[in-house]
Amino acid sequence: MSFIKYISDEFHYKEVLSLVKKTKRTVWIGTADIKDLYVDDKPFLALIASLLKKGVEVRLIHAKEPGIAWREDHEKHPILYDGMERVLCLRVHFKLIIIDSTIAYVGSANLTGAGMGMKSPKKRNFEAGILTDDPEMLEAAIEQFDNVWIGKFCKDCGRREYCSDPIK
C-alpha cells in the first residue's frame, strides 16, 4: 500500500532531507533556488559528495546560479565536478526530490536553509509539500524532471536568449 504524507515547515528537514542521506542508487533534485544549505553540521554538498563516493547518481536542476557560499562549498569537494550532473533551466520553478525512483517529495520548498526548515522558527519559510511512494504520482514527478533534464522544451523555449547554458 502506498503512502502520501503532508510535509510542512521544519519537517522538510526532518523527513525529506533525512531520506536523501539514505539514498542507495539515485537522487534527482529540482529547485528554483539553491543556497548553502546545511544538514546536521555539514554543508548539503558534503552529503552529496559522500553519496557520489558510494556510487549514487546525483542530478540537480536549478533555475538560479548558486551564491558564493554554495560555490565555495562546491570547491571543497572535487568529486562534485564530474560526479554530480547539473542542469540550469531558468524556467524551473518546481521543487522535486526523487530518491531511488521509489519516493518523491513534491512541494514548495527550495533547496535553501529557510526553505528546508533549517532556519530558526522566526526566520524559516512557511513551506508545504507531499512525500509519497504512490506509483502514479512518482511516475508523474519522474517524467516531469526527466523531460526538463533531456531538454524537451528547449527548442521552443521563449527564454532561450537568456539561457547561459542551453541543454540542447
Which positions does each model-derived feature cover?
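A conditional alpha-helix N-cap/helix-loop micro-motif detector
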Residues: 9-10, 40-41, 86
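Acidic/glycine-enriched edge-of-secondary-structure segments
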Residues: 1-10, 31-35
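Primarily the HKD phosphodiesterase
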Residues: 13-81
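Short beta-alpha junction loops
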Residues: 62-68, 92, 135-137
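Short beta-strand scaffold segments in enzyme catalytic cores
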Residues: 95-98, 128-130
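Signature of lipid phosphatidyltransferase scaffolds
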Residues: 105-168
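Glycine-centered positions within short beta-strands or beta-hairpins
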Residues: 101-102
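Short solvent-exposed loop/turn micro-motifs enriched in small/polar/acidic residues
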Residues: 87-91, 123
